Swiss-Prot record:
<keyword id="KW-0833">Ubl conjugation pathway</keyword>
<dbReference type="GO" id="GO:0008270">
    <property type="term" value="F:zinc ion binding"/>
</dbReference>
<comment type="pathway">
    <text>Protein modification; protein ubiquitination.</text>
</comment>
<keyword id="KW-0479">Metal-binding</keyword>
<keyword id="KW-0808">Transferase</keyword>
<dbReference type="GO" id="GO:0004842">
    <property type="term" value="F:ubiquitin-protein transferase activity"/>
</dbReference>
<dbReference type="InterPro" id="IPR001841">
    <property type="entry name" value="Znf_RING"/>
</dbReference>
<dbReference type="Pfam" id="PF14369">
    <property type="entry name" value="Zn_ribbon_19"/>
</dbReference>
<keyword id="KW-0863">Zinc-finger</keyword>
<feature type="compositionally biased region" description="Low complexity">
    <location>
        <begin position="74"/>
        <end position="89"/>
    </location>
</feature>
<feature type="region of interest" description="Disordered">
    <location>
        <begin position="50"/>
        <end position="92"/>
    </location>
</feature>
<dbReference type="InterPro" id="IPR013083">
    <property type="entry name" value="Znf_RING/FYVE/PHD"/>
</dbReference>
<feature type="zinc finger region" description="RING-type; atypical">
    <location>
        <begin position="253"/>
        <end position="294"/>
    </location>
</feature>
<dbReference type="GO" id="GO:0000209">
    <property type="term" value="P:protein polyubiquitination"/>
</dbReference>
<comment type="subunit">
    <text>Interacts (via N-terminus) with CG7546 (via Ubl domain).</text>
</comment>
<feature type="compositionally biased region" description="Low complexity">
    <location>
        <begin position="338"/>
        <end position="350"/>
    </location>
</feature>
<feature type="compositionally biased region" description="Low complexity">
    <location>
        <begin position="55"/>
        <end position="68"/>
    </location>
</feature>
Length: 380
């Protein structure tokens, strides 16, 4: 007689792990066997018959710590309390401190005090305090996760810090990161202090903030630089044809990076750089320089013309002063000791009155110009 076999389908038990860096039992939702808290791989799979850690004890301990911390604070502290197991182990304070320092990255933060201290033996408490910040209730707001740590129920540390820094006032300030006993500060000391000053709104926090700053800088660069070249000057740029020698030299258009073809018509700038017309004209409509050497195409580089323009703008009197200065320099070079009237301000003024009796007083007042040479300074 055949016996009936009854097979009972039992759900597979979830695997349990223990992180030796955080000293806490964890659930690993990924396949690379890394702790979701410290991102380290120093984890151990617990046997199925191992006693499960009591979460009520650690949760009560963390809640008690949150309550006592809130009652003893000034009311302007946000508290993030993560309770661990009841076995008396602690979350690695050094790892937590490094996360905060890496996040802040020496940014200036006003009115900030960050304290990491051991909570007896069962948890670590992170105090985020802002002196002069928005006042809160007498009891601190706490986030507690005791016993088995579930990453889905824990906010990331950088999000908590970001939200807190955004709520800080704009007053000037001090900030301090203090690691409590056993925290293992920088250089192996027991306590470590780091100070920050400034306004967090003036800095980029996280990748999105950095992208925003870079985007703003690029937008500003688009509107800066030399002015556009006039259409008349663009039309004056000569058209030349590519010869066989230039083709053999593999000359390219530096804008589109296409090789020039023989007998192809291109534009040749004064700096001898060659471009396709449909490539260089849009550039010159925005910038009056060569894209390669940045040579300006707006001016001819004639300093004499610029000097004449300045003299014409200030009037013939300044031009006469310039000629007098040249004559004084020439007489000095030839060793002539004959004093010039221009070297004596009173004599120059008297002669000016005699030679220009019909001068307009308003025009004369407008033409009071200081003139400098190597040895003298006088007022015309």
């Amino acid at each position: 007689m055949a016996e009936a076999m009854v097979v009972e389908d039992r759900p597979a038990e979830a695997k349990r792990f223990f992180c030796h860096m955080c000293n806490v039992e964890i659930n690993i939702p990924n396949s690379d066997f890394t702790c979701p808290l410290c991102a380290n791989g120093f984890v151990e799979e617990l046997p199925a018959n191992a006693p499960e850690m009591d979460s009520s004890t650690a949760g009560a301990s963390g809640s008690a710590r949150s309550g006592s911390s809130g009652s003893g604070s000034s009311g302007s502290h946000d508290t993030l309390s993560r309770g661990s197991s009841s076995s008396g182990s602690q979350v690695n304070v050094e790892s937590l401190r490094n996360d905060i320092v890496s996040l802040l990255n020496m940014r200036n933060v006003p009115n900030l005090e960050i304290t990491i201290e051991p909570n007896r033996r069962h948890s670590n408490v992170l105090h985020l305090g802002g002196f002069g910040g928005p006042s809160g209730s007498d009891s601190a707001r706490g986030l507690t996760a005791g016993g088995r740590v579930r990453p889905a129920n824990l906010d990331r540390l950088d999000n908590v810090l970001f939200d807190f820094l955004q709520s800080l006032p704009l007053a000037g300030a001090t900030a301090e990161i203090v690691t409590g006993p056993g925290g293992g500060g920088v250089g192996g000391g027991g306590n470590s202090h780091m100070f920050f000053m400034g306004n967090p709104g003036d800095y980029a926090w996280g990748r999105e903030g950095l992208d925003t700053i870079v985007t703003q800088m690029l937008n500003q660069m688009e509107t800066s630089g030399p002015p556009p070249l006039s259409a008349q000057r663009i039309n004056e740029i000569p058209n030349v044809q590519i010869n066989a020698e230039e083709v053999n030299r593999k000359i390219q258009c530096s804008i589109c990076w296409d090789d020039f073809k023989i007998d192809e018509t291109v534009r040749k700038l004064p700096c001898s750089h060659l471009y396709h017309e449909n490539c260089i004209v849009p550039w010159l409509n925005l910038h009056s320089t060569c894209p390669i050497c940045r040579k300006s195409l707006a001016d001819d580089g004639n300093d004499a013309d610029d000097e004449f323009v300045m003299l014409d703008a200030f009037g013939p009197e300044m031009a006469a002063d310039g000629s007098n200065s040249e004559r004084r320099s020439a007489s000095t070079a030839t060793g002539t000791d004959n004093p010039s009237p221009a070297n004596n301000p009173s004599q120059a003024a008297a002669e000016g009155g005699r030679t220009r009796p019909d001068a307009n007083p308003a025009q004369a007042a407008r033409n009071n110009i200081f003139t400098f040479d190597d040895d003298n300074m006088f007022l015309d």
